[in-house]
Design a protein with these regions (language model features):
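Charged, glycine/proline-rich intrinsically disordered loops and linkers
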Residues: 58-83, 129-138, 142
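Short active-site oxyanion
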Residues: 32-33, 93-96, 145-148
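Catalytic binding pocket for nucleotide-activated donors in carbohydrate/polymer assembly enzymes
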Residues: 103-183
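Conserved catalytic-core segment of nucleotide-activated headgroup transferases in glycan assembly
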Residues: 1-76, 151
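C-terminal alpha-helical cap of glycosyltransferases
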Residues: 187-199
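Acidic donor-binding loop of glycosyltransferase active sites
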Residues: 75-83, 88-102
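Short His-Asn-centered micro-motif
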Residues: 1-2, 36-37, 98-101, 118
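Amphipathic coiled-coil/heptad-repeat helices and related helical stalk/stem segments
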Residues: 11-18, 83, 90, 101, ...
Length: 199
C-alpha cells in the first residue's frame, strides 16, 4: 500500500481496511503488506494500524532529505539515490500495489505489475470524497483503457487481491499503454532529458 500526503485524510482508514480484509485470507495463502508512506507525511496517523497488524504489515519509510524550513512541501524535500533503490526493490518484490490514485501505479507498470485504486469513501458524510480525487484532469488519460483495477467497496479488497494472486485474472491489462501516455519514452533517457531541460 502506498500512502498519500496529509491532504488525503483517510489514508489510515484505507490501510486498516486492507489489513482487516487480508487478515481474513487463510494463513498459508495470506500475502504480507508492505506499506510505503508518502515522503512528506511524517505524521503518526498510521501508528495504531501498524501496531495492531504487526506481523502482517511492514512499513518501509522513503529515504528523502528535507531542505529549508518548510518541512511539509515537495519543493523542499527530495529523494536520495538510496530511496530510488528502495523503491525499485519494493516494486520488484511486490505482486501489486493498492492506493488512492497514486502515481505508484506507473512505478509498478514499469515492471508490468498491476495496481488497484481504492474507489470508495471510508467515512460517510465527509467533505473529502473519493469522487473528487478521480475527477482531477490527469485521470482523463485513463479513458478508453483498462489500466488499473478499481476497488469500489471495502468488501471487494480481499477477493480482488486473492484473484490477482491466485487466478489467471488480469488486472489493468492496458497498464503499459497508460504508462506510455503519461511518461516520455524511452524511460532510460528521462534523466538525461531532464538535465538538458534544467540546463
Amino acid at each position: 500500500y502506498s500512502g498519500n500526503d496529509a491532504s488525503s485524510p483517510y489514508e489510515a482508514n484505507y490501510l486498516e481496511d486492507i489489513c482487516e480484509e487480508i487478515s481474513e485470507i487463510e494463513e498459508n495463502k495470506r500475502p504480507q503488506i508492505l506499506f510505503r508512506r508518502c515522503p512528506v507525511d511524517k505524521s503518526n496517523r498510521f501508528d495504531k494500524v501498524l501496531e495492531k497488524y504487526k506481523g502482517l504489515i511492514f512499513s518501509i519509510d522513503p529515504d528523502w532529505r528535507i531542505d529549508k524550513e518548510n518541512r511539509d512541501s515537495f519543493a523542499t524535500i527530495y529523494p536520495t539515490l538510496n530511496d530510488v533503490k528502495l523503491l525499485v526493490n519494493t516494486v520488484f518484490h511486490s505482486d501489486l500495489v493498492l492506493n488512492l490514485g497514486s502515481t505508484m501505479a506507473h512505478d509498478f507498470a514499469v515492471l508490468n505489475k498491476p495496481c488497484f485504486y481504492l474507489n470508495y469513501n471510508p467515512v460517510k458524510n465527509s467533505i473529502f470524497k473519493v469522487e473528487d480525487v478521480y475527477s482531477f484532469q490527469h485521470f482523463n488519460s485513463l479513458k478508453d483503457i483498462d489500466a488499473v483495477g478499481f476497488i469500489n467497496h471495502k468488501n471487494d479488497i480481499k477477493k480482488n487481491i486473492y484473484d490477482t494472486l491466485f487466478s489467471s485474472k488480469v488486472i489493468g491489462k492496458d497498464r503499459i499503454n497508460w504508462l506510455n501516455r503519461i511518461v516520455l519514452h524511452p524511460l532510460e533517457k528521462n534523466s538525461k532529458n531532464l538535465i538538458e531541460e534544467i540546463e
